A protein has these predicted regions:
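AMP-dependent adenylate-forming
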Residues: 27-31, 90-116, 226-232
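Gly/Ser/Thr-rich phosphate-binding loop
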Residues: 325, 351-355, 366-429
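Conserved AMP-binding/adenylate-forming core of the ANL superfamily
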Residues: 38-43, 103-157, 174-179, 234-241, ...
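Structural core segment of the AMP-binding/adenylate-forming
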Residues: 161-241, 350, 357-358
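Conserved ATP/PPi-binding loop(s) of AMP-dependent carboxylate-activating enzymes
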Residues: 437-438, 451-488, 526-527
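AMP-binding/adenylate-forming catalytic core of the ANL superfamily
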Residues: 144, 169-194, 209, 347, ...
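Conserved pre-ATP/AMP-binding loop-to-beta segment of ANL
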Residues: 99-101, 223-224, 234-238, 242-265, ...
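Conserved AMP-binding/adenylation subdomain of ANL enzymes
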Residues: 284-302, 311-352, 367-369
Length: 533
């Protein structure tokens, strides 16, 4: 049995958002969960209409909820959540509109930039005005080849505000990788920066744009923002000029709950990457649930995730604004000059949540990095994702980074633009284990024949009931062959996620890697995380 590394105090449990949420449920539905997470999770999947309705209210989502919560369909992915609901995604993220800090950006060079909530609101409204002026309408696609900067978020929010569809690639994608993705969705506008830094090198993005335009004829306009405020002469539309020359557009039209908000991409290991389309309300309610109930993010918290704009954790981080938390961006190498870049950033700004990839923690462990000398007094939560966090790395975090911290190993993916197996504020942390299934997500582990495995047996991660953040569609998939092949080929009308996983006796999970990456020596399946320990 894996050892307990950390347990929340009674005070911490009672001060959590999840405790407040479950107390409201107990009173309203005359039920008692105590602080038994599994009981609460069971209720959330067995009474999922009540659960998702209560989430909308508890998170104070702005929009029209509608009376119908779930419109069921015999076909799993055709089930609709809040079918009469309407929201404006951007409005839910920028409504704080005061003079406190909303976003901080730091590049690997140490350059920092900040924006307050009221300026974020204003610039979003001006950029949306520009989009309308040049004829951008709902469902038009905006492509962004961008570093992880404040301007990236402003252009995303402006896009969402007018009902257009956002899609981003990070600068480390080569030209062909960008074209393989964006060509499929026929964007009207390309947003980019003049350059970016990585590992001490200044890399031009302007040099790559002519080739991209040659290969994607649908792009009619290019908008360029200045990285680190340094101007570079170019023939494209200046982001700074847009802000100076356009009016404030404070009209927040509400769109259907499942109106497309962004397009993400599968890895593209075989053929062209698949274009995964996510709905605005679907993504918002799922991400707010994860941040507020599972990661205990509160108003004025300081939320950081090390991510690029080509990874779904960027979308997840941006949703922190909907929780009225400040978010912190980092662009560049996490190990440039020193291995303490990110820890120092955490200390300088006193992050409350510090999110990284499992491989980052593994690298710190390998280098025997000791973070004890840093002042991380406000750090409540560390989250790790991207690959399984092995037992030894759990132990390292508690020994060398912080003893009293909630270490949340989390796992989900681009397909759900969220998290399936996740942390929670009620349970203890066991070395090597993800704490729990996500609320409202009917997680199970199946064998090859579609039967639930026993505790301790490895199998396939599945979801047995529809959930909000399923893709609303795949782009260019009129026959639905792509979406059906991606998730429903193995088990009939059951979401097959493609992770090789085991449920533990502690109520948690251990993920061993992707199902299609497991090896079978002598007929025994071995996951990638077991090979690379």
């Amino acid at each position: 049995m894996n050892e307990i590394l950390w347990s929340p105090s009674n005070e911490k449990i009672k001060n959590s958002n999840l405790f407040n949420f479950k107390t409201l449920i107990e009173k309203k539905y005359k039920i008692n969960f105590d602080t038994d997470y599994e009981k609460l999770w069971n209720w959330s999947v067995n009474y999922n209409e009540n659960f998702w309705s209560e989430c909308w209210d508890f998170f104070k989502i702005q929009g029209t909820k509608g009376k119908e919560i779930i419109r069921k369909d015999e076909i799993f992915h055709k089930t609709k959540f809040f079918p009469n609901g309407k929201i404006n995604f951007a409005k839910n993220l920028i409504s704080k509109n005061n003079s406190e800090l909303a976003i901080t950006f730091r590049s690997e060079t140490g350059f920092e930039k900040h924006i307050e909530w009221n300026k974020l609101y204003k610039k979003t409204c001006i950029f949306s005005s520009f989009l309308k002026k040049i004829g951008i309408k709902k469902n038009d696609r905006i492509a962004a080849y961008v570093p992880n900067a404040i301007e990236t978020i402003i252009t995303f929010l402006g896009t969402a505000k007018v009902g257009a569809i956002w899609s981003s690639c990070s600068p480390d994608f080569g030209i062909q990788g960008v074209v393989d993705r964006f060509l499929q969705i026929e964007p009207k506008i390309l947003i980019s920066a003049n350059y970016y830094f990585y590992n001490g090198k200044k890399i031009s993005l302007l040099d790559k744009i002519p080739e991209i335009l040659k290969k994607i004829p649908s792009i009619k306009e290019v908008v360029i923002f200045n990285y680190e405020n340094e101007k570079t002469k170019n023939p494209y539309i200046s982001f700074d000029n847009i802000l100076e020359e356009n009016q404030l557009d404070e009209d927040f039209e509400e769109f259907p709950f499942d109106h497309p908000i962004y397009i993400l991409y599968s890895s593209g290991t075989t053929g062209y990457p698949k274009c995964i389309v996510h709905g605005a309300g679907n993504a918002l309610i799922e991400q707010m649930k994860e941040l507020i109930l599972h990661c205990d993010v509160k108003e004025n918290d300081k939320l950081f995730y090390f991510t690029s704009t080509g990874w779904m954790m960027w979308n997840w981080l941006v949703a922190g604004l909907a929780c009225k938390a400040s978010i912190y961006l980092y662009d560049g190498s996490p190990f440039y000059k020193n291995n303490d870049c990110l820890i120092k950033y955490c200390e300088d700004h006193q992050f409350t949540l510090f999110g990284v990839a499992a491989k980052y923690i593994d690298q710190l462990k390998k280098e025997r990095f000791d973070a004890k000398k840093y002042n991380l007094k406000n750090l409540k939560t560390i989250t790790s994702t991207g690959s399984p966090l092995v037992k030894e790395s759990f132990i390292y975090v508690y020994e060398k980074i912080k003893k009293d911290v909630h270490l949340g190993s989390i796992s989900g993916g681009t397909d759900v633009v969220g998290v399936i197996n996740i942390c929670n504020p009620f349970n203890s942390i066991y070395a090597g284990e993800i704490q729990s299934p996500s609320l409202g997500i009917d997680v199970d582990v199946f064998d090859e024949n579609g039967n639930s495995t026993k505790i301790g047996e490895k199998g396939e991660l599945v979801i047995k009931k529809p959930f909000p953040s399923m893709p609303v569609m795949f782009w260019n998939d009129k026959t639905e062959d792509k979406i059906l092949n991606a998730y429903f080929r193995k088990y009939k009308n059951i979401w097959h996620h493609g992770d090789y996983i085991q449920k533990t006796k502690n109520g948690g999970y251990i993920i061993y890697g992707r199902s299609d990456a497991t090896l079978k020596p002598g007929g025994v399946r071995i996951g990638t995380s077991e090979i690379y320990r």
